[in-house]
Amino acid sequence: MEEKQILCVGLVVLDIINVVDKYPEEDTDRRCLSQRWQRGGNASNSCTVLSLLGARCAFMGSLAPGHVADFLVADFRQRGVDVSQVTWQSQGDTPCSCCIVNNSNGSRTIILYDTNLPDVSAKDFEKVDLTRFKWIHIEGRNASEQVKMLQRIEEHNAKQPLPQKVRVSVEIEKPREELFQLFSYGEVVFVSKDVAKHLGFQPAVEALRGLYSRVKKGATLVCAWAEEGADALGPDGQLLHSDAFPPPRVVDTLGAGDTFNASVIFSLSKGNSMQEALRFGCQVAGKKCGLQGFDGIV
């Protein structure tokens, strides 16, 4: 029997990336070291990483027909990512972002043209055959619709024996009030440093203690904190930690968080413990920060 896939639901965007030797001053002309088009977006990047790690994965998100979408779909396919779940929208444009990556310290500055493209709806998600997937990861975006999607997965799981249940993770990355309702769904909840700080918590350990009451019974809350590594808190009340694994030189942090999330999901889906998954996530994300793009993370 064919192995079930991991499905990532969320954003895909065209990243036009300019790599510079130092961050440009306003109102000056500069040459860049290199420029590339790269498929981006949190869920999209996580698919790239899952595929590179050897997982069978699929992407679900919105695209509008046109040259940009053609490039993105071709790149998904070249990476071995299943795009049969993509929602094709008749209105709006595929989003695009201009990214400045500072080669001297790896910082990334993103200017997103977030177009009028509708997000995937609960109605779109009704068409998904849940039996095809062993894990579904949802990047928090249009949360009120995504809650309905998560409830559909819960209803499906209630009728399944344990080995057939779909495992679920959610990511709460942006400090938007609407997204916070997603805390109470999923067995793994990734909360970002930005959200933790927005809610008044730092460092990661304090965020986990302060926010754990929001997750559902039995869930694990995970918080990565850049060069300080990552922490997790599960139902047993034990705080887990992994140090970061910085590369010899940081050159590109664009997509590092998406790399961490995907690597944790990959490790857990293989039956590893949360401690092992946390360490693996930090290792792969650290390696990615020493590379332009994602090739070479494994």
From Swiss-Prot:
Keywords: ATP-binding, Carbohydrate metabolism, Kinase, Nucleotide-binding, Transferase. It is an enzyme of class 2 (transferase). Beta-D-fructose binds at D15, G41, N42, N45, D258. One of its GO terms (molecular function) is ketohexokinase activity. GO terms for biological process: fructose catabolic process; fructose catabolic process to hydroxyacetone phosphate and glyceraldehyde-3-phosphate; fructose metabolic process; glycolytic process through fructose-1-phosphate; regulation of glycogen metabolic process. Requires potassium. Inhibition by ADP. Gene3D superfamilies: 3.40.1190.20. It catalyses: beta-D-fructose + ATP = beta-D-fructose 1-phosphate + ADP + H(+). Pathway: Carbohydrate metabolism; fructose metabolism. ATP binds at R108, A226, E227, E228, G229, G255, A256, G257, D258. Its EC number is 2.7.1.3. SUPFAM superfamilies: Ribokinase-like. It holds the Pfam family PfkB. GO terms for cellular component: cytoplasm; cytosol; nucleus. It comes from the Eukaryota. InterPro entries: Ketohexokinase-related, KHK, PfkB_dom, Ribokinase-like. Belongs to the carbohydrate kinase PfkB family. Catalyzes the phosphorylation of the ketose sugar fructose to fructose-1-phosphate. Homodimer. This is Ketohexokinase. It comes from Mus musculus.
